[in-house]
Amino acid sequence: MIDINSIKEALPHRYPMLLVDRVLEVSEDEIVALKNVTVNEPFFNGHFPQYPVMPGVLIMEALAQTAGVLELSKEENKGKLVFYAGMDKVKFKKQVVPGDQLIMTAKFVKRRGTIAVVEAKAEVDGKLAASGTLTFAIGQ
């Protein structure tokens, strides 16, 4: 398990954009992490005040950060940055609301030089909330 302090060492993101709370499992090419979604998230102030729903783009950002933790925790990538290069086949299946625990899985499926492709999914209570293929560039 990777705690929040180690996540902050790997990722440059900070409040309010740090969207990974804890890593539950990690292997060479796959990671499972969680985000506790609370009513105090700043994005709920405007999305939507009477019916708070986590924006889909932030779910995808949380998945990207999950993959980033895996890649940036590797010795050869310490001190580097991971840049979002694209998203494909993104689908949103379930609303994510305050009180949900978002379980995020990212699996690297292809690497070529500094480019990596990840299959990612986010689930709440075992039900698919979002999924997609993410492309990253690893840079200085």
From Swiss-Prot:
User: Has keyword Lipid metabolism?
Assistant: yes
Q: Which UniProt keywords apply?
A: Cytoplasm, Lipid A biosynthesis, Lipid biosynthesis, Lipid metabolism, Lyase
One GO MF term: (3R)-hydroxyacyl-[acyl-carrier-protein] dehydratase activity
Answer yes or no on keyword Cytoplasm: yes
According to its UniProt record, which reaction does this protein catalyse? a (3R)-hydroxyacyl-[ACP] = a (2E)-enoyl-[ACP] + H2O
Q: Name one GO cellular component term.
A: membrane
Catalytic residues, per the record, are: H47
- What GO terms in the biological process aspect are recorded for it? fatty acid biosynthetic process; lipid A biosynthetic process
**Where are the bilayer-spanning segments?**
none
**Enzyme Commission number(s):** 4.2.1.59
Q: Which Gene3D superfamilies match?
A: Hotdog Thioesterase (3.10.129.10)
Q: Name one Pfam family in it.
A: FabA
Which cellular compartments is it found in?
Answer: Cytoplasm
Its annotated function is as follows: Involved in unsaturated fatty acids biosynthesis. Catalyzes the dehydration of short chain beta-hydroxyacyl-ACPs and long chain saturated and unsaturated beta-hydroxyacyl-ACPs.
Question: What is stated as this protein's family in its record?
Answer: Belongs to the thioester dehydratase family. FabZ subfamily.
Return the protein name: 3-hydroxyacyl-[acyl-carrier-protein] dehydratase FabZ
